[in-house]
Amino acid sequence: MRHYEIVFMVHPDQSEQVPGMIERYSETIKQGGGQIHRLEDWGRRQLAYPINKLHKAHYVLLNIEASAEVVEELETAFRYNDAVLRNMIMRKKESITEPSPLTKPKEDRKGDSEAA
């Protein structure tokens, strides 16, 4: 099985449905023999540019280990779900389990950029 990083954006009016969507997609992954290494709900965030005249969207990040069939099933689910505005699935070399920079407190992020 391969490792993937998935980010999908949900219509801001459908934010209350996000926990159900996450549960549904998690079940799809687990039933296909996959594993979720990291799951982060980033909440509503400003978009870099308007999509369908919207300026905000609800973001969700998943790092999973799954077969290609499961990933194809997720892609199909994203495509036919009208609430999902955009999605991105990237193949990774290894699993990523540490928290993403977006979930760190702002003080920690400032310290990281100064140290670089």
From Swiss-Prot:
The keyword Ribosomal protein applies. It comes from the Bacteria. Residues 104-116 have a biased composition (Basic and acidic residues). Keywords: Ribonucleoprotein, Ribosomal protein, RNA-binding, rRNA-binding. GO terms for biological process: translation. GO terms for molecular function: small ribosomal subunit rRNA binding; structural constituent of ribosome. One of its GO terms (cellular component) is cytosolic small ribosomal subunit. Residues 94-116 are annotated as: Disordered. Disulfide bonds: none annotated. Belongs to the bacterial ribosomal protein bS6 family. Binds together with bS18 to 16S ribosomal RNA. This is Small ribosomal subunit protein bS6. It comes from Idiomarina loihiensis (strain ATCC BAA-735 / DSM 15497 / L2-TR). The lineage of its organism: Bacteria, Pseudomonadati, Pseudomonadota, Gammaproteobacteria, Alteromonadales.
